[in-house]
């Protein structure tokens, strides 16, 4: 990956998103820091870097649509969609289907019959990504792999690879001075 852009993104994530202190993660585990990546994924410069670096990271996967479980994946998917390069559309997987309107679980671009990249902002256990993977597969999409901006090195890679899917991340804990 482009080293200057990777370093710039790591610095932005360190400055904007890393919060030190005891926190409970979505997995229920406790940690001494939290990576609130929405502070970076919704930042004008960091978002542009995320889009370009995620496209570069997954450039050998020929996907047509990108998305994941709301809320963390939403700005990552739109950053990829808007990054320079070939047209890629985006979708959002709801945590539960709507009970009104069209009652959809997946919003945005159709995934049925398409090659799909599932994304996350920060991966801990991989459960959020795997929830999105299953929703896409049930809707008829072909998931090519999972990519995340920050991997916490706490089991996500192993869980996703155990499902037969490749897993990649732009940044790890060492990049953020946490490893």
Curated annotation (Swiss-Prot):
Magnesium found in the keyword field: yes
SUPFAM superfamilies: PRTase-like (SSF53271)
Annotated binding of 5-phospho-alpha-D-ribose 1-diphosphate, by residue: 94-95, 98, 100, 120-128
Catalytic activity: orotidine 5'-phosphate + diphosphate = orotate + 5-phospho-alpha-D-ribose 1-diphosphate
CDD domains from the UniProt entry: PRTases_typeI
EC code(s) of this entry: 2.4.2.10
Record-level Gene Ontology MF annotations: magnesium ion binding; orotate phosphoribosyltransferase activity
GO biological process: 'de novo' UMP biosynthetic process; pyrimidine nucleobase biosynthetic process
Enzyme class, broadest EC rank: transferase
Biochemical pathway: Pyrimidine metabolism; UMP biosynthesis via de novo pathway; UMP from orotate: step 1/2
Pfam families from the UniProt entry: Pribosyltran
Record's signal peptide: none
Swiss-Prot/TrEMBL keywords: Glycosyltransferase, Magnesium, Pyrimidine biosynthesis, Transferase
Sequence positions that bind orotate: 124, 152
Keyword hit for Plastid: no
Cofactor: Mg(2+)
Function: Catalyzes the transfer of a ribosyl phosphate group from 5-phosphoribose 1-diphosphate to orotate, leading to the formation of orotidine monophosphate (OMP).
Subunit structure and binding partners: Homodimer.
NCBIfam families the UniProt entry points to: pyrE
UniProt family annotation: Belongs to the purine/pyrimidine phosphoribosyltransferase family. PyrE subfamily.
Protein name in the entry: Orotate phosphoribosyltransferase
Source organism of the structure: Mycobacterium avium (strain 104)
